Amino acid sequence: ATYSLANERLRALEDIEREIGAILQNAGTVILELSKEKTNERLLDRQAAAFTASVQHVEAELSAQIRYLTQVATGQPHEGSSYSSRKDCQMALKRLDYARLKLSEVARTCEQMLEN
Amino acid sequence: MAQQRALPQSKETLLQSYNKRLKDDVKSIMDNFTEIIKTAKIEDETQVSRATQGEQDNYEMHVRAANIVRAGESLMKLVSDLKQFLILNDFPSVNEAIDQRNQQLRALQEECDRKLIALRDEVSIDLYELEEEYYSSSSSLCEANDLPLCEAYWRLDPDTDSTDCLSAPLLASPEPSAGGPLQAAAPTHSHAGGPGPTEHA
């Protein structure tokens, strides 16, 4: 759920990667089909159409991604960070740890008193 | 300064080179595929003998198939480059991610602090009860010299009887020269000052 926007784009790129694999697969199937004595024309047509569609889709998607990057890229490195809040959070956790330590000391003292 | 100004241009050229690579690779895939299909056609006999022609076609197909695979791999590389570029330079999503992380961490911190404060309130009450128990029990009499808490108490008024000593820690607590435990207990006493005596009464 976190980092949804960036993740979406990355996931789209992963889909494109898979589609590139599908392109090669389709091309291979088409050529394999051609090499057969009796070719199944329907299958051939379907695979060839899938191949062309995949290639066009990949090209369009990648063009769109590059166009988006042209829009957002400024050339300056990003300078924001979550370090300060992370530090604050760590301090809070340390406080809790320390409190727990002290409490366990108190508990030990109590037990000692009970034993005596 | 000059370097900073040069950077956007290089980004621009980088993106343009990405675009060029994309176009080249796609074109290469399509062209090579078409050529392979064309080569598959059996041509009429020419001056070149059948066997030679077949060998040549075989070789050409190998090369073209390798070209297609190379173009595909190049596209993969392009996608990975784009991913990297996206992670490094996609400011809107980077900002969003940082905001979300900040919110998460702040919520966690607030929860921690809230729990700590709740713990403090509980512990101050418990400590008060513990001390009460301790001063009214016999162990405080026999081990008075061992514990600084007790010591401070006894030093302050040594002749108080056991009924009065219940409220005595409250009086003794502001003493700055008191020992470690008492110092630690002092703020809790001042905090629990309100509910303390009423409970006691």
From Swiss-Prot, chain B:
The lineage of its organism: Eukaryota, Metazoa, Chordata, Craniata, Vertebrata. Component of the Mediator complex, which is composed of MED1, MED4, MED6, MED7, MED8, MED9, MED10, MED11, MED12, MED13, MED13L, MED14, MED15, MED16, MED17, MED18, MED19, MED20, MED21, MED22, MED23, MED24, MED25, MED26, MED27, MED29, MED30, MED31, CCNC, CDK8 and CDC2L6/CDK11. The MED12, MED13, CCNC and CDK8 subunits form a distinct module termed the CDK8 module. Mediator containing the CDK8 module is less active than Mediator lacking this module in supporting transcriptional activation. It is found in: Nucleus. Its main location: nucleus. GO terms for cellular component: mediator complex. Component of the Mediator complex, a coactivator involved in the regulated transcription of nearly all RNA polymerase II-dependent genes. Mediator functions as a bridge to convey information from gene-specific regulatory proteins to the basal RNA polymerase II transcription machinery. Mediator is recruited to promoters by direct interactions with regulatory proteins and serves as a scaffold for the assembly of a functional preinitiation complex with RNA polymerase II and the general transcription factors. GO terms for biological process: regulation of transcription by RNA polymerase II. It holds the Pfam family Med22. One of its GO terms (molecular function) is transcription coregulator activity. Keywords: Activator, Coiled coil, Nucleus, Transcription, Transcription regulation. PANTHER family: MEDIATOR OF RNA POLYMERASE II TRANSCRIPTION SUBUNIT 22. Residues 93-123 form a coiled coil. Residues 166-201 are annotated as: Disordered. It comes from the Eukaryota. This is Mediator of RNA polymerase II transcription subunit 22.
